[in-house]
Amino acid sequence: GHWGKPFIIFPSSRGRYFDYEGMGMIEAIAGFINAGKIKLFCVDSVDEASWYNYAVSAADRNARHEAYDRYIVEEVIPFVRHHCQSPQERVMANGCSMGAYHAVNFFLKHPDVFEGTIALSGLYRLDRPEFQLSAAELPGVYFNSPLSYLAGIDDPWYLDLYRRSKIIVCVGQGAWEDEAIEDTRRLDSLFREKSIPAWIDYWGHDVN
């Protein structure tokens, strides 16, 4: 895009930066892009080396993700701001599936950098079976498991920024969405408990 609100697009599980276009998402929102309302910055993931790298310890997986976190915040964000000619610009985070996890996690950890999130069909806790983390390992990844750490956030600095942000979380109700529905409901509950405005949308039973 040539102008508009910047979005960082996180790919789905083990995905690449070009997947968003390959899955038809660019075409679907082309009207907004061409009208100068939004501009997209699609990034690679390191899921294969972090949360899905079952060959290494939880600590190593967490450390790899933290390196990715620094890359996004310290390198990608400055690039986006320079590109937008807006040195204080807060960007939006967007993603589907594992990309939704990243979109929510980055927003919650860095609300001074991210203005909000649009997350679609994500899992928001790292104790899900697909991540293969034991109960003993979970404390070491606590601060990257949104449904874990969000419950304990009471710092007014974070809460005030959350309440002034744009939060949209959607999930289908079709096949394979059970865990995503459960996590979305829990996220919705936590937002309500903390008086954080959010648009939570449950799509049809034909959507997955």
Give the positions of each predicted feature.
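Non-catalytic cap/lid and distal C-terminal segments of serine-dependent acyl enzymes
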Residues: G1-N208
